[in-house]
Amino acid sequence: MKNIVRTFFAAALLLSGLHVYAQPQAGDNQRLTPQVMARLFPAGVVSPEYNADGSVTFRCQAPQAQKVSLDCQMLPAETPMTKGENGVWSITVTPGKPDIYPYAFVVDGTKIADPNNMFIFPNEGFKYSLADVRGAEPSVQDIQNVPHGKVSYRFYHSETCGIDRVMTVYTPAGYDPAGSEKLPVLYLIHGMTDTYETWFKVGHMNNILDNLIAQGKAKRMIVVMPYANPYPEMIRQGKAQMYNAMDTDLVTKEILNEVKPFIEANYKVKTDAASRAVAGFSLGGRQALACGLGNPKDFKWVCAMAPAIFGNEYEANFQSGVYAPVGSLNKNLKLLWIGTGTSDFLIEASRSLDGYLTANGVKHTFYTPDGGHTWMNCRDYLARIVQLLFK
C-alpha cells in the first residue's frame, strides 16, 4: 500500500509540471521530512516583494537572457533590470502612491507575465501581472473587515450570438435568493480586450461594493459583468459575423435580450427601469452610452468611464436613433455621468460631449481627475458612481 501511495505521489508531481531536482535518499521515503520537501520543492524567486519602506522589488529568473526590462504603470517608461546571482534579474521601484499596478517583464524583446505572481490581469490581448501596493490605511478597493458579498460565474446560451456564454455576477452580503428582498441591478461592462473577469480581478469591484455598502455610502445592489466581446468565439464556430469592435448594436442586443432576462429570471431583482443602471469603461463606456441612452425605457442610470467615442460622432448617434433624442434625456434619465482622466487619450472627445450636452441643457456630471486610461482611474470611477446609484 505504501508503494502505491509513493507511486501515486510521484506521478502527481510529474503531471503537475513540478521539477524533481533530487531523488529521495535511503530512509527518507518513509515520510516527507523537511530535507525531502526542500529537494522536491526548492525555494523559488519571490516577486513582487513588498518592502517595509514602501518600495517594491520585482524579480525575473532568466539566466540565458541578454536583456530584461520592467514594463509597469508605476514607471513612465520601460526600465532595464539588473542581472544578479543564478540568472535572477531584479529592480526595486517606489510607486507614487498605493494602488494596483499592472506590470510585465520584457525578456529579450518578448513581453511575459511574472511567472512567480499568481495575480494576473485577465485580458484577451496582453498578459500582465498585478502588483497590489498597500498603504498605511486600507483603501476602498482593499479587503476590509466587513461583510463580504459573492462573485459567481454564470453560464448561459445566447440566441443573439448563437453561442454559449459566461458572465460574472456580484451579490452583496446577506443576499438571499429565497428571501423577499429585491435589489436594483448595475450592468457593468469592461473595456476592449478585457473580459468578464477584469472588473472583479483588476477592478476589485467586489471589495469596493462591500466596503461602501458596509459604510452606508452605497445602496445594496447586484452587479452583472457580461462578456462584451462575443466575436472570437463566434468566429471560431464559423458564424458569419464580421468583427467590428466599435459596433455597439450586438452588445446592446445581448444585454437586453439575453443577459437582462437571465438575471431577472434567476435573481431577486427589481425590474423597473429606475432600478437598472448601465456603466462601462473605454469600449464598455461606448457600449454603455449606446445601451443606456438608446433604451431609456430599460435604464435610468447611465455612466460612461473614459468612453471610446471619437470626434463628434455622438451627434450622429443622437440624430440617427442610436441614442434617444437629446431633448428627452432630462425627462428619461435619473443620472448621466461621464468621467475621463485629464491625461487620457480620450479626454478631448469627452470634453466635446460634455460641451454638447451642456449646450443642449442636459443635466449630467462630468468628472475629470488626474490620470490616464488606466484601471487605477477605473476603480475611482466605480467607487464614485455606486454612491450615486438608486438614490
Stretches found by the model and what they are:
Residues 23-39, 50-69, 73-78, 83-391:
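Non-catalytic cap/lid and distal C-terminal segments of serine-dependent acyl enzymes
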Residues 45-49:
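Short beta-strand segments of immunoglobulin-like
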Residues 1-26:
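Bacterial Sec-dependent N-terminal signal peptides
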